[in-house]
Amino acid sequence: MAMEMRLPVARKPLSERLGRDTKKHLVVPGDTITTDTGFMRGHGTYMGEEKLIASVAGSVERVNKLICVKALKTRYIGEVGDIVVGRITEVQQKRWKVETNSRLDSVLLLSSMNLPGGELRRRSAEDELAMRGFLQEGDLISAEVQAVFSDGAVSLHTRSLKYGKLGQGVLVQVSPSLVKRQKTHFHDLPCGASVILGNNGFIWIYPTPEHKEEEAGGFIANLEPVSLADREVISRLRNCIISLVTQRMMLYDTSILYCYEASLPHQIKDILKPEIMEEIVMETRQRLLEQEG
């Protein structure tokens, strides 16, 4: 039986050695953002001695005259239109409570989802009694943020056929700040797997289906055995995402695909070794720079 022993070493993060974080204006609590009184105070800032000061550690974002600080490490703060992946935690009267990595549990109303088969009608008492047959505790779903309440709680909906219960796959939890906002967060990668990049930091990796079960209305999960080749692709993608997160790189379809291709010379179990992880991420970053430039 082979045994490998590794000793801890003083290793600098890849971002420090590359020194490429100069584009972002990073601040810590107490830093002065600006002394100009013409700007408006946003989230993560406060006024002190006629200066705008940061109250959290993060990156400064400006929208016209509004300045706010986006925290680097925080729980998910919902916005209307966000795509999220969540887990059902409780079945209540005419609603489900969903864990979405936010401060409060999110809510999915019975009236905010498609009925099995995509039937369009008013929800009846029979539908309410059958709620646990639709979704029960522990089920994973993909949904869209419909509304955000004053206390920060999020209301979800799954009215589109692309949302609904998730079948077989792997869930990876990352910081929401590392998921890049795009027009679409559902990606079928050419390597044979698909990913759902939730804005809440929950990433779902699953084998690409041969045909879409649109007539099921998002309730029938495919429980057929997953082939060994698909499981290896999913495992490699999972380790690649963890590698990108460890080196604080943004997650989107191109960065994940480039990292997957860079990891092909290595075994799946070796991807998480620090030296191989840095090699793969550095090659990924170089390809992204060549694409941008």
Curated annotation (Swiss-Prot):
Keyword Cytoplasm: yes
Cell compartments where the protein resides: Cytoplasm; Nucleus, Nucleolus; Nucleus
Molecular function GO labels: 3'-5'-RNA exonuclease activity; 7S RNA binding; RNA binding
GO biological process annotation, one example: rRNA processing
Keywords assigned: Cytoplasm, Deafness, Disease variant, Dwarfism, Exosome, Nucleus, Phosphoprotein, Retinitis pigmentosa, RNA-binding, rRNA processing
SUPFAM superfamilies per UniProt: Eukaryotic type KH-domain (KH-domain type I), Nucleic acid-binding proteins, Ribosomal L27 protein-like
InterPro entries cross-referenced by the UniProt entry: Exosome_cplx_N_dom, Exosome_RNA_bind1/RRP40/RRP4, KH_dom_type_1, KH_dom_type_1_sf, NA-bd_OB-fold, RRP4_S1
Purpose of the protein: Non-catalytic component of the RNA exosome complex which has 3'->5' exoribonuclease activity and participates in a multitude of cellular RNA processing and degradation events. In the nucleus, the RNA exosome complex is involved in proper maturation of stable RNA species such as rRNA, snRNA and snoRNA, in the elimination of RNA processing by-products and non-coding 'pervasive' transcripts, such as antisense RNA species and promoter-upstream transcripts (PROMPTs), and of mRNAs with processing defects, thereby limiting or excluding their export to the cytoplasm.
Quaternary structure and partners: Component of the RNA exosome core complex (Exo-9), composed of EXOSC1, EXOSC2, EXOSC3, EXOSC4, EXOSC5, EXOSC6, EXOSC7, EXOSC8 and EXOSC9; within the complex interacts with EXOSC4 and EXOSC7. The catalytically inactive RNA exosome core complex (Exo-9) associates with the catalytic subunit EXOSC10/RRP6. Exo-9 may associate with DIS3 to form the nucleolar exosome complex, or DIS3L to form the cytoplasmic exosome complex. Exo-9 is formed by a hexameric base ring consisting of the heterodimers EXOSC4-EXOSC9, EXOSC5-EXOSC8 and EXOSC6-EXOSC7, and a cap ring consisting of EXOSC1, EXOSC2 and EXOSC3.
Family, as annotated: Belongs to the RRP4 family.
Protein name: Exosome complex component RRP4
